[in-house]
Amino acid sequence: MLKIQGVKHFEKSRFFPFFSQNIRSFKYLALIGLGSNIEPEKKRFDMLFRVMMDDKRFKILSTSPMLINEAFGFKEQKDFTNAVMLIQTNLHARALLKVLLYYEVKFKRKRTFKNAPRTLDLDLLYFSQKVKRDKWCEVPHKGAKERVSVILPLGMI
């Protein structure tokens, strides 16, 4: 069996994984990275799923199973739960990122220090086939191609 350093296992919940048959005609595709290491991670991901399903600005196309993996950066913390979500939207990249940051606050994210434990971390990993780099928004996300927490879940959708 293949063993990847830091990777523990995949888990499922009510909405992770999820695959939609109903595709609407939104302008853009976006890949969102989800992360959490403050309990209850699964419940929080499912709550975010419901909130985004009810938000008319988005159509969720699919989600990955949840990957349990070791923390990186600041290692003296609980393992992380990570997943990816593929959505459709008419929002531009910066506007979408603003909504994601709002959701982090709504789910009580506190930014105490770099790589600190978090209730919810939402990253805009990819946005259609666009490349955008400014002080507010970087797409593709700088860690998207290297992080196991993105690569393995992405391979599951």
Curated annotation (Swiss-Prot):
Catalytic activity entry: 6-hydroxymethyl-7,8-dihydropterin + ATP = (7,8-dihydropterin-6-yl)methyl diphosphate + AMP + H(+)
Record InterPro entries: Hppk, Hppk_sf
Role description: Catalyzes the transfer of pyrophosphate from adenosine triphosphate (ATP) to 6-hydroxymethyl-7,8-dihydropterin, an enzymatic step in folate biosynthesis pathway.
GO biological process, one term: tetrahydrofolate biosynthetic process
Family stated for the protein in its record: Belongs to the HPPK family.
Pfam families with a match to the protein in the record: HPPK
Organism: Campylobacter jejuni subsp. jejuni serotype O:2 (strain ATCC 700819 / NCTC 11168)
Pathway named in the protein's UniProt entry: Cofactor biosynthesis; tetrahydrofolate biosynthesis; 2-amino-4-hydroxy-6-hydroxymethyl-7,8-dihydropteridine diphosphate from 7,8-dihydroneopterin triphosphate: step 4/4
Name of the protein this chain belongs to: 2-amino-4-hydroxy-6-hydroxymethyldihydropteridine pyrophosphokinase
Listed EC numbers: 2.7.6.3
Lineage, opening ranks: Bacteria, Pseudomonadati, Campylobacterota, Epsilonproteobacteria, Campylobacterales
Keywords, in A-Z order: ATP-binding, Folate biosynthesis, Kinase, Nucleotide-binding, Transferase
GO terms of molecular function: 2-amino-4-hydroxy-6-hydroxymethyldihydropteridine diphosphokinase activity; ATP binding; kinase activity
